[in-house]
Amino acid sequence: MSLSNEEMISNIRQKLNIVNQALFNPEKFKSTPHQDISEIYEFVMSKDSFSPSEVTAIADHLGQLRQDMED
């Protein structure tokens, strides 16, 4: 079963308990390479808990992958 980028981002947000979930709007990851999101997803789902620095690092990396579209 292969999840879409949007589904993986939603699951990552939930698992990391991201307070400002708007920062990681799944819609902004539609055109991100699937492999990039999949690697982060697999890492996040493989762990039971995260240190604050791990959450920050993951959030920073996701922020770099986010596709902010100018209207």
Curated annotation (Swiss-Prot):
InterPro entries named among the record's database cross-references: UPF0435 (IPR009507)
Record-given protein name: UPF0435 protein SERP1418
Record family assignment: Belongs to the UPF0435 family.
Organism of provenance: Staphylococcus epidermidis (strain ATCC 35984 / DSM 28319 / BCRC 17069 / CCUG 31568 / BM 3577 / RP62A)
